[in-house]
């Protein structure tokens, strides 16, 4: 195929380039509405300002020669400038800024879960007849997904680590089909534009948020008062644009669900995916609700909150309504689908590979220690305890390096969120008891536990770079003692430490 040739269209999707043209026309219509709103809003602000100035001088300016000509010229110029600036920002940087704010990353092909996502996006893209769709992963334990359009016009589908960890293959395919249906129908173009327009005001609000340190400085109140006016106007404008997103997106979710069934051929899988996302924590990243229309379910911190859809101003129909429609397509009932979710969860628990503790594997034998064991040296690729070569392995689908003798693990700090989000590994009762004993000891005296670690830890070298490992807690929420390389951002877990961390995290999430 030549560079200038268009790819052949699939049966499902209309011409992708025609969709882009139609959405361009729609975005111009939004620009016209925005300009009209600004003319009205700025006109009111200008009139209020001039009236206040005239009242102070004892003479209102409305009867002055040429007043209304100046008024309309100033109003139109300011409105056109702000509307064009916002429109240009949304078209040029909107999608990229949203991805950056959500900390989206390209899939790691060495990660089995990420590779499955990339392959699934490619399969559904081909079925839809789209020229190109990028895949992204959001480093978040929440369960959600979205579709948007990047600055260069390329569509993108992003899913969270929590979704990859919790969803079966057919559920991942159904969610991907839903997001690609939004792209093929043109929804993603328009919603990305609307959310980016609202995001413009969000950034203005952040600029004028009061600084608590400056609040006590004399002479700053007037500046803060002016900033408050601007921030209030920005908040109102953001609300207006967000309401437009709500109005255009609510029914589009139902249409995208139907189109996803045509692409993925599994209405039950999509219903399961929507229910699981709604029942889970689906709040993604650190952002306000202006991005809500982009997601498959409205971002929320807990299940059962009003944001679950259907209530104003939600951009999504009620989850119960969506499940009822999909259940009807699958010739079943929502109750049967929920029961199927529970059955699949039990099957998954039974299929877990159960990891024993180090003591169970070695029948209580101590870890081997030779004359070089624990000695700090610059040699790389060797276990810092046994001085034996490390082997490549997959742990929760993530590449790690393992010592086959002492069962220590070297893990890149960047992949820890993936490991802790996933639950394909089970743990023996002995490991669970070991984790509980650790939690109880830590609760009684965490500082004593850290001092004990510092006393017994011997100098050790990072197997990746040779830099000296430093004894540190994993973090200050999970005070598990590990050894971190401050040079290459890797963590060395001795036998059972990573498993204990996973057990504690899973118990915390279950609470």
Name these PLM-found stretches.
Residues 1-11, 18, 225-249, 262-380, ...:
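Cytosolic-facing loops and C-terminal tails of multi-pass membrane proteins
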Residues 67-98, 113, 122, 126, ...:
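Transmembrane alpha-helices and immediately adjacent membrane-cytoplasm interface residues
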Residues 383-386, 403, 462-465, 485:
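Short cysteine-rich clusters marking metal-coordination/redox-active sites
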Residues 370-380, 393-397, 448-459, 475-479:
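Short, flexible, mixed-charge glycine/proline-rich loop motifs
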Residues 187-216, 271-272, 276-279:
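Post-HEXXH active-site segment of zinc metalloproteases
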Residues 6-8, 87-192, 196, 285-286, ...:
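Peri-catalytic and regulatory segments of divalent metal-dependent proteins
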Residues 95, 122-125, 249-266:
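An active-site-proximal "capping" alpha-helix that borders the catalytic cofactor pocket
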Residues 409-427, 489-506:
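Short metal-binding segments enriched for Cys and/or His
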């Amino acid at each position: 195929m030549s560079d200038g040739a268009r790819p052949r269209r699939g049966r499902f999707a209309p011409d992708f380039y025609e969709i882009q043209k139609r959405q361009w026309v729609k975005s111009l219509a939004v620009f016209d509405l925005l300009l009209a709103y600004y003319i009205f809003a700025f006109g009111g602000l200008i009139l209020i300002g001039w009236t206040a100035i005239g009242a102070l001088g004892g003479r209102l300016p409305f009867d002055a020669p040429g007043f209304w000509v100046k008024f309309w010229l100033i109003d139109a110029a300011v409105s056109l400038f702000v509307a064009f600036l916002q429109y240009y920002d949304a078209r040029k940087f909107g999608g990229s800024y949203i991805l950056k704010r959500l900390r989206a990353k390209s899939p790691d092909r060495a990660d089995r879960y990420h590779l499955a996502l990339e392959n699934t996006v490619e399969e559904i893209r081909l079925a839809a007849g789209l020229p190109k769709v990028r895949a992204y992963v959001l480093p978040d334990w929440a369960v959600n997904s979205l579709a948007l359009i990047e600055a260069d016009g390329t569509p993108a589908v992003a899913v969270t680590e929590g979704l990859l960890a919790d969803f079966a293959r057919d559920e991942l395919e159904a969610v991907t089909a839903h997001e690609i249906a939004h792209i093929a129908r043109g929804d993603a173009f328009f919603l990305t534009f609307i959310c980016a327009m609202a995001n413009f005001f969000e950034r203005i609000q952040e600029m004028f948020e009061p600084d608590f340190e400056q609040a006590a400085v004399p002479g700053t109140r007037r500046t803060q008062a002016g900033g408050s006016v601007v921030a209030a106007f920005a908040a109102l404008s953001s609300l207006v644009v967000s309401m437009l997103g709500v109005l255009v997106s609510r029914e589009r979710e139902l249409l995208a669900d139907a189109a996803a069934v045509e692409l993925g051929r599994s209405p039950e899988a999509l219903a399961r995916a929507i229910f699981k996302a709604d029942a889970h924590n689906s709040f993604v990243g650190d952002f306000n609700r202006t991005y809500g229309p982009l997601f498959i379910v409205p971002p929320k911190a807990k299940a059962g909150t009003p944001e679950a859809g259907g209530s104003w101003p939600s951009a999504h129909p009620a989850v119960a309504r969506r499940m009822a429609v999909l259940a009807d397509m699958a010739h079943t009932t929502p109750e049967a689908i929920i029961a199927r979710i529970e059955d699949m969860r039990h099957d998954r628990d039974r299929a877990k590979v159960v990891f024993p503790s180090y003591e169970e594997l070695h029948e209580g034998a101590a870890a081997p220690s030779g004359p070089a064991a624990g000695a700090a040296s610059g040699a790389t690729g060797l276990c810092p305890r046994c001085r034996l070569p490390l082997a490549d392995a997959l742990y929760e689908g993530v590449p790690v390096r393992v010592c086959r003798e002492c069962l220590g693990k070297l893990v890149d700090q960047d992949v820890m969120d993936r490991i802790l989000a996933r639950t394909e590994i089970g743990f023996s009762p002995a490991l669970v008891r070991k984790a509980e004993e650790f939690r109880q000891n830590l609760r009684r005296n965490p500082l004593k536990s850290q001092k004990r670690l510092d006393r017994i830890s011997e100098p050790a070298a990072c197997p990746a770079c040779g830099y000296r490992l430093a004894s540190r807690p994993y973090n200050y929420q999970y005070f598990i003692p590990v050894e971190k390389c401050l040079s290459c951002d890797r963590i060395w877990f001795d036998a059972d430490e990573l498993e204990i961390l996973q057990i504690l995290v899973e118990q915390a999430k279950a609470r």
